[in-house]
Regions:
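Flavin-dependent oxidoreductase catalytic cores
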Residues: 1-313
């Protein structure tokens, strides 16, 4: 089974990808990392700072798949061409993001409101794709039954892979992923299918592999931030040790401090990781409030040392 790290804005950036690969990468279970979405500029002028995340030199030894968030097929096709010139083979199209600020612009899962517009978008992309294109999607806007018409559109095109998150746009991340709907639509998919949604434990991975052996892959998001060793454990490897987690944390923290130029900005980014990661530490729940209140580097470092003193769980 192929394992993929889901794109998560503010979490799975180049610094995290490098740290995760270094500390928890498993040769027997190589991970493909999907980068957080990039929106192509309407004036077709690339912003160097935004593109720096995807520079091959910034991602050595890591297999990265760039993801596009767009509603203009011609503009997306142009951006795919730019990414191919950077050396990327596969490019992923985001029709899954449920954020209101995204869908209000008709992007992400907002594209699923109108299958005809979705069809026109994909037609423009594939008429000049020049290589593999994959899609990440939800089942629809309000009802899982909408996916029949949406899937008819996807099946018209040679997608190299279709990643399905079996929720609808209006759910955001509430409720449970609809695996019954996923199972019902899976046989009708002509592209290789990857599953994404509510995968947080090794048991979840094994259950999916047993239920759907035909899957091309499984994509893990929040579960991998909460347990960086999750995919290593899935192939029989060890759980994360205290020393590994400390090295992983320090690489992230120092990497963000160097990138942002000040520890206080790095602290803000690290809090997003600790929201998930803290549950690996026994009794550390009591330190969540002091962690949230920390602003300066020294305050943050003091709390983090206390958290690591709580190991093991």
């Amino acid at each position: 089974m192929n394992y993929y790290a889901a794109p998560m804005e503010g979490l799975t950036d180049r610094i995290w990808r490098q740290a995760h690969q270094r500390w928890f990468g498993a040769p027997e279970a190589p991970v493909r990392y999907y980068a957080p979405f990039l929106s192509p500029p309407e004036n077709r002028v690339l912003i160097k700072k935004k593109m720096a995340e995807l520079e091959p030199a910034a991602n050595p030894g890591v297999q990265v798949i760039p993801q596009l968030l767009a509603k203009d097929g011609e503009l997306a096709a142009w951006m795919i061409g730019e990414l191919r010139r950077m050396g990327y083979t596969e490019v992923n199209l985001n029709f899954g993001c449920p954020s209101g600020t995204v869908t209000a612009k008709g992007k992400g899962s907002g594209m699923l409101r109108d299958p005809q517009k979705l069809d026109a978008f994909l037609d423009a992309v594939f008429s000049q794709a020049g290589g593999p294109v994959s899609v990440k999607t939800r089942l629809g806007v309000a009802r899982a039954e909408e996916f029949g018409e949406i899937l008819d559109v996807y099946n018209k095109y040679p997608l190299c892979e279709l990643t399905i998150h079996p929720r609808v746009m209006k759910q955001l991340y509430r409720g449970q992923a609809d695996r019954e709907a996923f199972a019902a639509y899976l046989p009708a998919c002509t592209a290789p299918v990857c599953y994404n949604g509510d995968v947080t434990t090794v048991d979840d991975l094994r259950a999916l592999e047993a239920a759907f052996p035909e899957l091309s892959g499984i994509m893990v998001g929040r579960g991998l931030i909460a347990d960086p060793a999750l995919l290593r454990k899935a192939v029989g490897g060890l759980a994360a040790s205290r020393e590994e987690l400390r090295g992983y944390h320090d690489e992230l923290y120092h990497g963000y401090t160097e990138t942002f130029g000040m520890a206080s900005c790095a602290v803000s980014r690290m809090k997003a990781h600790w929201f998930y990661l803290i549950h690996l530490f026994d009794g550390a729940d009591a330190l969540e409030k002091p962690l949230r209140k920390a602003r300066e580097g020294w305050e943050y470092e003091t709390v983090v040392n206390q958290i690591f003193a709580c190991w093991p769980k």
